[in-house]
Structures are given as C-alpha cells and as structure tokens.
C-alpha cells in the first residue's frame, strides 16, 4: 500500500482540476445550462457550482455531486475521471 504522504497538494489540486474540466466539457457537450443542472441536483447556489466547475477558491465536487451529475447528464461516472 502506498503512503498518503506521496500525494502532495499539487497532485491533489490537479486531480480536482481534471474532474472539473471533464464536468464542464461534458455538461457543455450535452448542452445543459449550469442553472438547469444545479436545480436538478438540488443545489441552492449556481455560484458554488461555478466555482467547483472552474476550480476557484478551493471549491471542488464531492462524490455525491459527481454521482448526481453523471445521472442527470446520462454518462458513465468514469467519464469524469479521464486523464487522471
């Protein structure tokens, strides 16, 4: 088993950014406006979603978000992890 100490902050940030880029790309490919997706997810803030999607202010999607987005956009959840 690998030690968690090998996962530095930069690698973790790249992980989150890759997921964010994939979420945004897939959402746009599906022609789904941010507001519609946010409402269908049951979120109360498009600002929060936008920050997650653009990796701003240390905001990122959690597993529940990724799961809901995959269902709403009708994509396999693994699509969000491509490039990692």
Please identify what each model-predicted range represents.
Residues 24, 35, 67, 78:
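Residues within the helices of the helix-turn-helix
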Residues 73-84:
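Short C-terminal boundary/hinge segments that cap the last helix of small helical domains
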Residues 31, 56-71:
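Short, basic-rich loop-to-helix N-cap that marks the start of a DNA-contacting helix
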Residues 27, 38-39, 70:
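The alpha-helix within a helix-turn-helix
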Residues 31-52:
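Short alpha-helical DNA-recognition segment
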Residues 44-45, 55-57, 84:
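The DNA-recognition helices of helix-turn-helix-type DNA-binding domains
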């Amino acid at each position: 088993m690998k030690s968690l100490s090998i996962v530095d902050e930069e690698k973790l940030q790249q992980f989150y950014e890759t997921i964010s880029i994939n979420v945004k790309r897939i959402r746009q490919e599906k022609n789904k406006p941010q507001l519609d997706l946010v409402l269908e997810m049951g979120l109360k803030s498009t600002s929060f979603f936008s920050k997650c999607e653009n990796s701003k202010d240390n905001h990122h999607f959690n597993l529940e978000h990724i799961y809901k987005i995959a269902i709403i956009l009708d994509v396999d959840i693994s699509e969000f992890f491509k490039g990692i």
